[in-house]
């Protein structure tokens, strides 16, 4: 997993509540178990019409937002069904962090496990950032995990909280599999003790 220290880039404003995982990565793109190759599916039904042509009104198709690195969203972002592809689609598109007022809980956890930083800010702060992003298309912000701050387009800093353990794993680029492998000896020792002390569980 790629370590996350900070991300600086263009803001992609998703100016509505309850953007669900079916919108983030529609079902027809869920034909793979691979992490790669999902960039085209990111917000696919919003980006393309029934003929596969780009919808010009979609922010993802507007020149100012090309190369965006940070999604700015409102309430309950990533709600709906559990699909890890929703996180992979963000990453495939080039998104490094999300700033939102709240998240679907499963999506939030999947983000942390895959190195996509989900920052939660008060709704009022999100509204301020959203107004700036919409007024100045293509403006940028910075998400700094070391200092736990979002730096808005105008230079204002917005502090955020994150679980200390998850923060450290993100900073080190360590996922749950890496963590388990690092503790393989301890796990094996526990299994041997358990087999000896509780053989009926074997």
From Swiss-Prot:
Under Enzyme Commission nomenclature, its number is 4.2.1.33
Which reaction does this enzyme catalyse, per its entry? (2R,3S)-3-isopropylmalate = (2S)-2-isopropylmalate
Any one biological process term the GO annotation gives:
L-leucine biosynthetic process
- Indicate whether GTP-binding appears among the record's keywords: no
Q: Which family does it belong to?
A: Belongs to the LeuD family. LeuD type 1 subfamily.
- Subunit record text: Heterodimer of LeuC and LeuD.
> What does the organism's lineage look like at the top?
Bacteria, Pseudomonadati, Pseudomonadota, Betaproteobacteria, Burkholderiales
Q: What does this protein do?
A: Catalyzes the isomerization between 2-isopropylmalate and 3-isopropylmalate, via the formation of 2-isopropylmaleate.
The residues the entry assigns to the signal sequence are none
Q: Name one GO cellular component term.
A: 3-isopropylmalate dehydratase complex
One GO MF term? 3-isopropylmalate dehydratase activity
Q: In which pathway does it act?
A: Amino-acid biosynthesis; L-leucine biosynthesis; L-leucine from 3-methyl-2-oxobutanoate: step 2/4
Q: Which NCBIfam families match?
A: leuD (TIGR00171), PRK01641.1 (NF002458)
Record key words, sorted: Amino-acid biosynthesis, Branched-chain amino acid biosynthesis, Leucine biosynthesis, Lyase
Q: Which organism is it from?
A: Bordetella pertussis (strain Tohama I / ATCC BAA-589 / NCTC 13251)
Name of the featured protein: 3-isopropylmalate dehydratase small subunit 1
Matches recorded under CDD domains: IPMI_Swivel
Q: Which InterPro entries match?
A: 3-IsopropMal_deHydase_ssu, Aconitase/3IPM_dehydase_swvl, AconitaseA/IPMdHydase_ssu_swvl, IPMI_Swivel, LeuD
Give the gene that encodes this protein.
Answer: leuD1
**A Pfam family name for this chain?**
Aconitase_C
């Amino acid at each position: 997993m790629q370590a996350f220290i900070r991300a600086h880039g263009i803001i992609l404003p998703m100016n509505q509540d309850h953007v669900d995982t079916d919108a983030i990565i529609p079902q027809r793109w869920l034909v793979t178990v691979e992490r790669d190759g999902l960039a085209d599916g990111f917000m696919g039904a919003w980006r393309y019409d029934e003929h596969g042509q780009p919808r010009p009104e979609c922010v993802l198709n507007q020149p100012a937002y090309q190369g965006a690195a940070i999604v700015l969203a409102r309430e309950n972002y990533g709600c709906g069904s559990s699909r890890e592809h929703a996180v992979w689609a963000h990453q495939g598109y080039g998104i490094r962090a999300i700033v939102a007022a709240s998240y679907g809980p499963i999506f939030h956890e999947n983000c942390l496990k895959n190195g996509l930083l989900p920052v939660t800010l008060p709704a009022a702060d999100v509204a301020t950032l959203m107004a700036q992003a919409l007024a100045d298309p293509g403006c940028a912000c910075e998400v700094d995990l070391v200092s736990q701050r979002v730096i808005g387009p105008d230079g204002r800093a917005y502090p955020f909280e994150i679980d200390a353990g998850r923060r450290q794993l993100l900073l080190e680029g360590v996922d749950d599999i890496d963590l388990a492998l690092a503790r393989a000896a301890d796990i094996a020792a526990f299994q041997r003790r358990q087999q000896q002390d509780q053989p009926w569980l074997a």
